A protein has these predicted regions:
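The feature marks short-to-medium sequence segments in extracytoplasmic or secretory-pathway proteins
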Residues: 77-123
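Short, surface-exposed ligand- or partner-binding patches at beta-edge/loop junctions that are enriched
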Residues: 141-159
Length: 189
């Protein structure tokens, strides 16, 4: 009888330990995934030409240029991936073309990198903030002269889900403009 009580007590002890372990793991997993990715942007002057975002004409081509600072805040307790940050050009809600991500430029003989050492994909540590200089460009000839009425900031998350939010509304695509830069950060996501 006494052995049966000891065996029964041991089984209860093991079961309660296992249940307690799984409850603790579930709670830790839930807590580490609590939080979000916040993305802020700020339009700035181009590092090479010292011009703000907009449309620019040369003798042979028209360009759409967007120099941008981006700040990514990870409020989760686990690392997060923000992959392939780009600008999408939309016409009446449909994606027409993505811009070209500029990886680097040469200044006084020194190569300076955009993004994360030339990459527009970012690994953000838990409860951290990352700030990056980005630059995007598109030639009018690359889009066949098509117009667009909206520019969206786009990226893929850890699960390969694509996210897109409006950054600018465009009234007259390909008409030369020199827009003002942002005075403060704007939350996009």
């Amino acid at each position: 009888m006494q052995i049966d009580v000891m065996v029964f007590g041991g089984i209860i002890s093991i079961l309660s330990s296992v249940v307690s372990f799984f409850c603790q793991q579930y709670w830790l997993n839930w807590r580490s995934n609590k939080g979000e990715i916040k993305i802020y942007t700020k339009t700035v002057y181009d590092k090479v030409d010292k011009v703000p975002w907009g449309f620019y004409e040369t003798s042979s081509e028209t360009f759409f240029i967007v120099p941008l600072w981006i700040e990514i805040q990870n409020t989760k307790s686990i690392k997060q991936i923000v992959r392939d940050v780009n600008l999408g050009l939309f016409l009446e809600g449909r994606l027409i073309k993505k811009t070209t991500q500029i990886n680097s430029f040469i200044k006084k003989g020194v190569t300076e990198m955009y993004g994360d050492n030339g990459s527009y994909s970012f690994l953000i540590d838990a409860n951290e903030i990352g700030r990056y200089d980005l630059s995007f460009i598109l030639r009018k000839s690359e889009i066949g002269g098509k117009g667009f009425d909206e520019v969206k900031l786009m990226y893929f998350d850890l699960d390969d889900n694509q996210h897109a939010k409006t950054l600018f509304k465009i009234n007259d695509a390909w008409k030369e403009t020199k827009n003002s830069i942002d005075e403060d950060w704007r939350r996009v996501f």
